[in-house]
Amino acid sequence: MTSVRCKLAQYLEDLEDVDLKKFKMHLEDYPPEKGCIPVPRGQMEKADHLDLATLMIDFNGEEKAWAMAVWIFAAINRRDLWEKAKKDQPEWNDTCTSHSSMVCQEDSLEEEWMGLLGYLSRISICKKKKDYCKMYRRHVRSRFYSIKDRNARLGESVDLNSRYTQLQLVKEHPSKQEREHELLTIGRTKMRDSPMSSLKLELLFEPEDGHSEPVHTVVFQGAAGIGKTILARKIMLDWALGKLFKDKFDYLFFIHCREVSLRTPRSLADLIVSCWPDPNPPVCKILRKPSRILFLMDGFDELQGAFDEHIGEVCTDWQKAVRGDILLSSLIRKKLLPKASLLITTRPVALEKLQHLLDHPRHVEILGFSEAKRKEYFFKYFSNELQAREAFRLIQENEVLFTMCFIPLVCWIVCTGLKQQMETGKSLAQTSKTTTAVYVFFLSSLLQSRGGIEEHLFSDYLQGLCSLAADGIWNQKILFEECDLRKHGLQKTDVSAFLRMNVFQKEVDCERFYSFSHMTFQEFFAAMYYLLEEEAEGETVRKGPGGCSDLLNRDVKVLLENYGKFEKGYLIFVVRFLFGLVNQERTSYLEKKLSCKISQQVRLELLKWIEVKAKAKKLQWQPSQLELFYCLYEMQEEDFVQSAMDHFPKIEINLSTRMDHVVSSFCIKNCHRVKTLSLGFFHNSPKEEEEERRGGRPLDQVQCVFPDTHVACSSRLVNCCLTSSFCRGLFSSLSTNRSLTELDLSDNTLGDPGMRVLCEALQHPGCNIQRLWLGRCGLSHQCCFDISSVLSSSQKLVELDLSDNALGDFGIRLLCVGLKHLLCNLQKLWLVSCCLTSACCQDLALVLSSNHSLTRLYIGENALGDSGVQVLCEKMKDPQCNLQKLGLVNSGLTSICCSALTSVLKTNQNFTHLYLRSNALGDTGLRLLCEGLLHPDCKLQMLELDNCSLTSHSCWNLSTILTHNHSLRKLNLGNNDLGDLCVVTLCEVLKQQGCLLQSLQLGEMYLNRETKRALEALQEEKPELTIVFEISW
């Protein structure tokens, strides 16, 4: 009997060379879903018919090898061999025999053959589709594999994967920001919390939860230079590499909005053709499943102007050619291919307009680089690890610039400048602090490569470039035609020179249109336009384009008058750059480098403008004080800033970012005439609770005006997210502003390092801080030595709140060293909830007997216990003790400590306020206190006994106290189960003429209607008595 291998070889021998090659090709690509193993090409290349049969059986066994051959005969259209092999199929087992006999009937063979041809046809179509996708992915991979640096020479490029550094992304609803160019406000506090809300790229289009609708539109928002375009290109590359959206989208099309916004009509099919590797893409087949397509639109804000004119026009036909902005508008509004997905990048300026076009979009904010990613970027940029380490160390030392490097564009500029310095062998000097300084340095490095351009010609080119930039800013224009260049004295050949310098680049796909390589460069040169002058017949004038009279009429005064009026703030960065450029050292540097004349008149105009704005009332179109501070900070010239800050009678700003802290610190330390200073978190609201009602906390916000000087002396920075690294510059203002006497830093994570910086400032002779609040500042015992040094060296500090900091007993021991010092003049001290135990009470007791200035001590919410209070009471009986108010709220006390407190009430006539809320004293404890309260030397005015486990058994003692104690004015008894009879009895006592109580707080009690009526009757009969009660039924 002939073996299966020989039979199979005989069939293969009937194949001619062409068919045998086809057979091998199908054998290599055999569908895996059929359960057989494809034979590798390398083992089939030189195999003859016998070798091939052997390989098929070795890989899959006889039965599967035969089935593979039968299927491939059909695939290569050899029906004769297919029918013969079907009829000649060996008997494998009973099941197969039965099956074989059934399918070998002539009718069955015919039906099976036709069905198999249909299946193979469908397989062919799918394979063609896969071939299209595979070819397009290869094209996208090739197109987006590399990027060009802005300063790259011809032919130079950088591998995108090796340079790309991960950006932080968070889901966020769009905010109604009025300013487009607030680059520095992107690094805000939530950036530190972003791991909790960060979004992974692969989840961009996933629903929020299992019940939500899928997401079809995603909007990436971020300021200029934050990395929107590079992220969009990375998404394209990762998709092409099969790393992203592999099973979600068959096609991703990258659209440059500024290119599509041109007036040339085009259809959606034309857009796809422009993305395809050859001129004949299968558009119909691509658009057959729009849900498998993602359009990635980069730079929506760059076509905003065009949208204004044609927002109502719609295109629904993918073959119809329309204006580019109408085409994109139709895609965005889901009028064209409504089932397709969109990913749009934009600056915040265009968010409001974009929002009206979208239906349920997901907004994702790009926050830039985290601190760790900044370091990663440096090490990726510099191929030499030693250079990377040196550059990163330098930037880290300049904290302001390191902060700015969260913006990828700034990071690139800084790295470029440092690398050029390294390559020339120059030592790395202290890097500049501001955006202007970074751009000036970058421009100077570009000028080194200006080639053979003559000096006077270059000056003309630069002037034309600056006027072009300014004209574009005023008209909100970023794409320029050749006629625009000619209007500003520039020729096509001139632009080539700038292309070599990478300041002004020619568009690759739009040959007749030109743009600045980045919007911020256009803003920088627009600011320079207002500074460049030339000598004309003995007079210095500002030079401008001959055909642009409108721009000549828009001088610095007009620029500043319009600053703040533009709804979207297009002039903000231009004015900031203007301030930065008039720095005298920078002006001299530019005049030398550019061989040009810089206007000095602009400095006077800017100072006059600041003076007017500093005194102006708050109006919607007025720039905020913080924005003015940003302008002054950009200048980095302290004499000018001091002159400007003299015009601010009142400073009231909200801080929300790190740069806000840095900028405000720089300006405030140069401010010597301010009368009111108020700094706060944007969402901060004042806490208006009484000090006594708090039973141990000062106000979180204080606005105190001394009547003799009429100068506000309060500064509050509550919940400003200050950290220790931002404190040094801010605290330096404490030594220069002598009118500042109150400082509230509550709810800021200063930590011990920040506290150390603050203590250095507090010990400065020029510092006049008297009241300092540091609640919830993340302090530990390690800072207590520094605080103790302040207490022992400064007699000005009279009030200190350290509540809600884990100082511990050891921290209090260190603190008490300063409190016992002869120079310590502290009067009020809050140590509420500081992780204290009875072990600290001995140290505090020694303070009470030696410090004669301390009159208020609040140490509640600590586990002091009865033993701790007993130790304190021993020293409070000392005649030298001047303590007036003691807060022991929720301190784990029982009736055991009440005898010691009674002794204090009997002996210390200075003692007037005692807070015992939330301690289980019980009726026994009150009975013991009653003895002290009835003593003739007792001068207590305020007694707080809320939630102290009192019952109706305390009624007689309470009545006795109210009747015989003539000093007590306020009594709190809330949240005690006194009962109706006791309360009614107290009402009768309070009606007596000898009772001098002014305030009775009963809080929440279970009282009946009769008791309520008794309280109301008492209130009417004795209006000078305030009764606060809340009845629970």
From Swiss-Prot:
PTM description: Phosphorylation at Ser-194 by MAPK8/JNK1 increases inflammasome activation by promoting deubiquitination by BRCC3 and NLRP3 homooligomerization. Phosphorylation at Ser-803 by CSNK1A1 prevents inflammasome activation by preventing NEK7 recruitment. Phosphorylation at Ser-3 in the pyrin domain inhibits homomultimerization of NLRP3 and activation of the NLRP3 inflammasome: dephosphorylation by protein phosphatase 2A (PP2A) promotes assembly of the NLRP3 inflammasome. Phosphorylation at Ser-291 by PKD/PRKD1 promotes NLRP3 inflammasome assembly. Ubiquitinated; undergoes both 'Lys-48'- and 'Lys-63'-linked polyubiquitination. Ubiquitination does not lead to degradation, but inhibits inflammasome activation. Deubiquitination is catalyzed by BRCC3 and associated with NLRP3 activation and inflammasome assembly. This process can be induced by the activation of Toll-like receptors (by LPS), through a non-transcriptional pathway dependent on the mitochondrial production of reactive oxygen species, and by ATP. Ubiquitinated by TRIM31 via 'Lys-48'-linked ubiquitination, leading to its degradation by the proteasome.
Motif (KFERQ-like motif 2): 601-605
CDD domains assigned: LRR_RI, Pyrin_NALPs
Chain location of the short sequence motif KFERQ-like motif 1 per the record: 351-355
GO CC annotation terms, alphabetical: canonical inflammasome complex; cytoplasm; cytosol; endoplasmic reticulum; extracellular region; Golgi membrane; interphase microtubule organizing center; membrane
A family per Pfam: PYRIN
Domain Pyrin: 1-91
Annotated protein name in UniProt: NACHT, LRR and PYD domains-containing protein 3
Originating organism: Mus musculus
Underlying gene: Nlrp3
